[in-house]
């Protein structure tokens, strides 16, 4: 057997994951671990409650926020083309974000603002420090009420999909003041939607087309996109929301993903398979793998957060690191911080559909898990913690 994992460890990993399906945590899942050239895939359960057919390795899942690093890679490709740079003001392509004003404090009325001290840059957007993002207690703030009235959704995955087009969405954001001065504070999520629209404006083509031609086709990601074609809908898993009475169906195979969305959302709109995700993660692990340059990968994995960002957003970062460009990254101190074997380590991210991916350069372990159960918190679920604990224990 290859040296990446122990046979007993992989058996224990399979038992752990199938156990969560057996107890009803999720209807089904597909997980992959890879180390030292050895790949092991676990499939368990079915694609929907009440479906007696076993889930296949080619099952299609809503990957939610695992979309973010993929869109980040597309931006880096455009940077390599010379079409834009990290230090460029985004208003060159997104004039809706020019001349920003900033709330004096988060609970201020919308007209209680001051001028932005500088323009928003491409790096600000990709590092989630452009001045706007998820408000964790939205009911308390006038700006959150205005956001909801416009139809923007910055908390959680983009479900149900917005009826707004990319142009309408960015125009709506442009009508709101920023929450912080550009470049001063990390706020989750919204930067990824902006990044997707930025790709469209810079490339002069729809985001779905840019991703297909620049990322998916070169990497052989044949089942990844913003909707599922008719001939593949039978492979799309159903999505469930956990509650006191068990799992409630949120979206089925012929629901939101049966047709292209009005807004291809860079924050969480993609569907994919375990093998497509492995192709993307392997590209990054190979320092770009011939798609991205080594320098682009280095820039994506460079932590941009401050200690204040880490403290304020501990629910996102845990004790493991910070944020690079469109994904979580390990920090120098991360190795001495963690005591929980289930904490995701390395670079990657997690999704609101229960998905998780990390590549840990320290151990060479890559793990990916795709599920169909919506998260109830930004913190890792019990299933996610158990997956990472078992995956690490399986390493030889």
What are these regions (language model features)?
Residues 341-347:
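Short, hydrophobic/aromatic-rich segments at coil-to-beta transitions
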Residues 40-42, 352, 357-358, 364-373:
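Short, well-ordered beta-strand elements
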Residues 17, 37-39, 62-90, 192-200, ...:
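Active-site SXXK
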Residues 9, 13, 63, 67, ...:
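Hydrophobic (often cysteine-bearing) scaffold residues that line and stabilize catalytic clefts
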Residues 373-396:
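Generic C-terminus detector
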Residues 91-99:
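Acidic helix-start/capping segments at beta-turn-to-alpha-helix junctions
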Residues 3-63, 83-85, 101-108, 392:
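Short, conserved catalytic-motif segment at the N-terminal edge
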Residues 101-341:
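Short, surface-exposed loop or secondary-structure junction motifs
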């Amino acid at each position: 057997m290859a040296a990446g994992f122990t046979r007993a460890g992989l058996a224990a990993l399979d038992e752990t994951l199938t156990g969560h399906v057996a107890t009803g945590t999720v209807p089904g899942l597909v997980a992959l671990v890879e180390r030292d050239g050895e790949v092991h895939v676990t499939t368990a359960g079915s694609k929907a409650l009440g479906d007696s057919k076993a889930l296949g390795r080619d099952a299609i899942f809503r990957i939610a926020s695992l979309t973010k690093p993929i869109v980040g890679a597309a931006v880096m490709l455009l940077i390599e083309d010379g079409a834009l740079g990290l230090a460029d003001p985004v208003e060159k392509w997104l004039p809706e974000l020019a001349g920003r004003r900033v709330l004096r404090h988060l609970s201020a009325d919308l007209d209680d603002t001051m001028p932005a001290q500088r323009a928003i840059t491409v790096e600000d957007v990709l590092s989630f420090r452009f001045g706007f993002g998820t408000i964790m207690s939205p009911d308390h703030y006038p700006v959150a009420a205005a956001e909801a009235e416009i139809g923007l959704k910055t908390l959680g995955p983009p479900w149900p999909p917005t009826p707004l087009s990319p142009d309408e969405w960015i125009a709506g954001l442009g009508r709101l003041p920023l929450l912080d001065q550009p470049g001063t504070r990390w706020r989750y999520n919204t930067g990824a939607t902006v990044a997707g629209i930025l790709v469209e404006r810079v490339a002069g083509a729809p985001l779905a087309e840019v991703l297909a031609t620049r990322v998916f086709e070169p990497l052989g990601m044949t089942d990844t996109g913003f909707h599922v074609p008719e001939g593949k809908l039978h492979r799309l898993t159903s999505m469930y929301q956990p509650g006191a009475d068990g799992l409630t169906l949120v979206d089925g195979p012929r629901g939101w993903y049966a047709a292209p969305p009005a807004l291809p959302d860079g924050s969480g709109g993609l569907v994919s398979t375990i093998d497509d995700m492995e192709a993307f993660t392997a590209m990054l692990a190979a320092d770009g793998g011939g798609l991205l340059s080594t320098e682009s990968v280095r820039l994506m994995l460079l932590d941009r957060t401050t200690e204040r960002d880490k403290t304020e957003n501990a629910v996102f970062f845990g004790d493991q690191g910070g944020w690079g460009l469109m994904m979580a990254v390990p920090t120098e101190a991360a190795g001495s911080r963690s005591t929980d074997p289930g904490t995701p380590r390395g670079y990657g991210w997690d999704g609101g559909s229960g998905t998780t991916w990390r590549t840990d350069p320290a151990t060479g372990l890559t793990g990916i898990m795709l599920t169909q159960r919506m998260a109830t918190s930004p913190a890792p679920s019990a299933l996610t913690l158990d997956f990472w604990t078992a995956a690490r224990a399986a390493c030889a």
